Every structure is written in structure tokens, then in C-alpha cells.
Amino acid sequence: MPMILGYWNVRGLTHPIRLLLEYTDSSYEEKRYAMGDAPDYDRSQWLNEKFKLGLDFPNLPYLIDGSRKITQSNAIMRYLARKHHLCGETEEERIRADIVENQVMDNRMQLIMLCYNPDFEKQKPEFLKTIPEKMKLYSEFLGKRPWFAGDKVTYVDFLAYDILDQYHIFEPKCLDAFPNLKDFLARFEGLKKISAYMKSSRYLSTPIFSKLAQWSNK
């Protein structure tokens, strides 16, 4: 029985989950909920089901795998990673994975707060000034390793890929000074399952955010 992944019909928090499901050749189906247009931004597709799915903390995204019903994007990522032994093999690798997981969420929320802010255009110039330091930290942490935890792919590479790609879309020159990050993106996109998925009709690169956002909302 295929797993069910539920989320809005956008990239959002679910991009790394979709990529991980594809990489692991998992059997899954998507339930993509549509949001209405302005001014009401109707969310009834989701709200009509929200409390009928048996979720402990009803929210999007959710993953239903048989009797297991999981919400919170990183909880879903960790669940899938444990199933497929992608959490890191040594304590050092698991520590690195934990750090990257939380760093990615910090940087994700910073971009979200900007892009959903009514003063987006006014605040964007100052935000752009902070990006080089963010990218520098990722570059130094990755170093000469092929993957963020070490020599093998782990679930945090899917998270890192997503956030670096989002920032790269937001500011196309932000990785120019960090060749190891550009190489990482290319290496990730070159993974056989990932490459095939990105060429498929199921792949959703944009919009990154919902219709309520000021950027990448359609």
C-alpha cells in the first residue's frame, strides 16, 4: 500500500520529502491541496479534511504510512531516513546531520518571514546583504566532503540542497564565491533517481510559497 504525502500544491516544506521519497524509490501518492485566490485565499480543501485524518497534530505536510501518521516536515524526513539507513553511520556523522537539519530550518524560516512580509520590497535589500555570510558558513561546514555529513548521502543533503537552491533562485549570484556549494548542487542533481524525478511531470520546482507570499507565489 503506497504512502500518502499531503501538502499544498506548492514546493514549500515538502520539497526535500518528495526528493527523499524519490531517491529511496518509495511507493507513495500525493494529496496536493489547492488554495483559493485573493482576497479570501480559500483553504477549505484542506480544512474540510484536517481533523478527519487521525493526525495527532493536524497540519501540513503529513505522511501516512499504513498505521503510522506523521506530521512536522523534519519528523517525516527523519522517519524516512531511519527506514532507509540515511541518518549517518557514525556519531560524528549524526552530529553533523543534526546541526545541518536545524541550521537549514533557521535559514528557511528567515526567508519565509521575509517573503510573507507585506514590506518585502523594503526589507529585501538588507536581507540580501546577509546571504553571503549564510552561504559562507555552509561552504566552510561542507569543506571538501562530497556530502554534508560525510562521504555518503544522508537525509540532510536533501534539506541542504533545498535551502541552497531556494537561496540561489532568490539571489542567482549567491553561490558564485562558493564553488564547493555549486558542486554539491550539481552532484545532488546528478543522482540517478533525482535526475529522473526532476525531468518528470511530477516534479514541482515552483511556486516555492503559497499565494499569500510576496515572492515565488505562482
From Swiss-Prot:
Pfam families for this protein: GST_C, GST_N
Molecular functions (GO terms): enzyme binding; glutathione binding; glutathione transferase activity; identical protein binding; nickel cation binding; protein homodimerization activity; protein kinase binding; steroid binding
Outcome recorded upon mutating residue 7 to F/L: Reduces catalytic activity about 100-fold
Keyword Glycosyltransferase belongs to the record: no
Binding-site list for substrate: 116
Entries under Gene3D superfamilies matching the protein: 1.20.1050.10, Glutaredoxin
GST C-terminal domain sequence ranges: 90-208
Annotated binding of glutathione, by residue: 7-8, 43-46, 50, 59-60, 72-73
GST N-terminal domain: residues covered: 2-88
EC number: 2.5.1.18
Root EC class: transferase
Subcellular location: Cytoplasm
Keywords: Cytoplasm, Lipid metabolism, Olfaction, Phosphoprotein, Sensory transduction, Transferase
Modified residues (Phosphoserine): 67, 205, 210
Gene Ontology biological process terms in this record: cellular detoxification of nitrogen compound; cellular response to xenobiotic stimulus; glutathione derivative biosynthetic process; glutathione metabolic process; hepoxilin biosynthetic process; nitrobenzene metabolic process; prostaglandin metabolic process; response to amino acid
Any one annotated GO CC term: mitochondrion
Subunit note: Homodimer or heterodimer.
Family membership: Belongs to the GST superfamily. Mu family.
Known role: Conjugation of reduced glutathione to a wide number of exogenous and endogenous hydrophobic electrophiles. The olfactory GST may be crucial for the acuity of the olfactory process. Participates in the formation of novel hepoxilin regioisomers.
Protein name: Glutathione S-transferase Mu 1
